[in-house]
Amino acid sequence: MAYIQLEPLNEGFLSRISDLLLCRWTCRHCCQKCYESSCCQSSEDEVEILGPFPAQTPPWLMASRSSDKDGDSVHTASEVPLTPRTNSPDGRRSSSDTSKSTYSLTRRISSLESRRPSSPLIDIKPIEFGVLSAKKEPIQPSVLRRTYTPDDYFRKFEPHLYSLDPNSDDVDSLTDEEILSKYQLGMLHFSTQYDLLHNHLTVRVIEARDLPPPISHDGSRQDMAHSNPYVKICLLPDQKNSKQTGVKRKTQKPVFEERYTFEIPFLEAQRRTLLLTVVDFDKFSRHCVIGKVSVPLCEVDLVKGGHWWKALIPSSQNEVELGELLLSLNYLPSAGRLNVDVIRAKQLLQTDVSQGSDPFVKIQLVHGLKLVKTKKTSFLRGTIDPFYNESFSFKVPQEELENASLVFTVFGHNMKSSNDFIGRIVIGQYSSGPSESNHWRRMLNTHRTAVEQWHSLRSRAECDRVSPASLEVT
């Protein structure tokens, strides 16, 4: 409730003037509240006059209230009539005035929040929001075309794929001693160290011990008592940029002591897996994989480095790769010339135990099933990653291009006997694989433009089986 208090003064004429001004100022606010109450149809019991009890309601307030209730007119604060006080004949106030009475006007607005007065001139109607011409339709669930059963979801489930073989052990859960006793493939000693200053990883292959006796798949191996081991190093998943140690002749306890560096950022090195594969070299037979060791580099403190003895485990790769060859092909229709660039090779199969390899490439043009021309590169001594950058040109008319084939054969130069075969590919009409066919097709679609591509070398038997052109060359 709001309280408005009137306190008249009893100081003669000045007090009467002050009292009048105070009443006028108070009545402005009082009448404003009365106006708001009258608009809301307030009842009589909402206005109470409190003062020193007993007290009578002033006549001017009674007149204002009765005029508001009748609705004859609405008075502002300045239009409210003031009833003068009745004085005694001697000019003094009555006993009720001289008692310094305090009049308080109490105004209670009980429903101000719930009932807001509307303007007498503007009638604001509530705005209704809605979507015009909206149709209400009942939503019906869609009917399934067929009834599904749990068997429909699990009909492709094959339980035999998830059955456990009690005889197979998880290699990761076995210790090195358990792996060694189970597979008996020997152990490998190596170390790693990362150089933060130069951003490269150094892998040191130290030695191996207790390697198993050699295995001959075709019966052509002469020495079945000793192995000729070497180690291939790569950072998975990249197996192309691998390193290879030298071959140690006739020993089951080879000592390598060789270091290899991989240029790789530190964060990238932590995502790689170091793979070391021990291979048995045989000049007259294919090279056999003895075993492997894999180390996730995220589990190793590369900066601090460390040494490990790890037991070799069997590898799913029984044969080593023969190497890769980078070639460029370009055909000039106006001149009828087929240009071939032998750029480089990498990770070629080693053909000499002591000196590595002296590789060279022989290029032979076959038209249909007839050998037409033979050319070859120079040989590079003691390397398995040769750089050639040699160009060759063959006369091939445009009408004969579709029937042409190029046979690329990598040999290891041998002055004492016949050259050692390393690998072969065929590009052209009788390509030896999808990669070779794709290279030839790209060259035919882009004349006068050199097209480069890496190719993985294949064995002689594989090329002879899929390409008739391979049978026409030596």
Swiss-Prot record:
Coiled coil: none annotated. Its main location: membrane. Residues 60-112 are annotated as: Disordered. Residues 96-112 have a biased composition (Low complexity). The modification Phosphoserine is found at residues 118-119. SUPFAM superfamilies: C2 domain (Calcium/lipid-binding domain, CaLB). It is found in: Membrane. One of its GO terms (cellular component) is plasma membrane. Residues 184-310, 321-455 form the C2 domain. One of its GO terms (biological process) is calcium-ion regulated exocytosis. SMART domains: C2 (SM00239). One of its GO terms (molecular function) is calcium ion binding. Plays a role in dendrite formation by melanocytes. This is Synaptotagmin-17.
